[in-house]
């Protein structure tokens, strides 16, 4: 099962670069490559929205590697925990974005 996240940003180019950079680091850490896809952006009310789809092997690898952190999140479902983890991951690395799961 792959997870798709909706990313919201006010500074698309800078935050896109930040996200790509840190996803690349994550891919290297987990030995997964070409493991996510980005949609075309759309803008509304000063915000830019785009989707980030994780391929299942990348999502599973992240979940296994960081299972101890994911277990601490107060969500009932794995998708909610994964979404919160990725939001915290991007924010901790200077990406000024909001992250929501797409159902």
Residue ranges with predicted function:
Residues 6-10, 53-55, 100-102:
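A structural detector for beta-sheet-dominated domains
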Residues 70-103:
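Conserved short beta-strand edge segments in small beta-sheet-based binding/regulatory domains
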Residues 16-40:
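Short, flexible N-terminal segments of the mature chain
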Residues 1-24:
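Short, extreme N-terminal segment that most often corresponds to the first beta-strand
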Residues 14-21, 57, 61, 73-85:
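Alpha-helix boundary/N-cap detector
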Residues 31-75:
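Short, intrinsically disordered low-complexity segments
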Residues 1-4, 45-49, 92:
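A general secondary-structure signal for short beta-strands and their flanking turns/coil
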Residues 5, 32-41, 95-102:
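Generic structural motif
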């Amino acid at each position: 099962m792959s997870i798709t996240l909706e990313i919201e940003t006010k500074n698309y180019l800078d935050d896109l670069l930040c996200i790509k950079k840190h996803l690349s680091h994550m891919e290297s850490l987990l030995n997964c490559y070409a493991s996510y896809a980005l949609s075309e952006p759309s803008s509304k009310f000063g915000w830019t929205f785009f989707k980030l789809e994780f391929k299942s092997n990348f999502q599973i690898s992240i979940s296994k590697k960081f299972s101890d952190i994911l277990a601490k999140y107060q969500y009932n479902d794995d998708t909610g925990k994964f979404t919160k983890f990725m939001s915290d991951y991007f924010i901790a690395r200077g990406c000024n974005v909001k992250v929501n799961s797409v159902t």
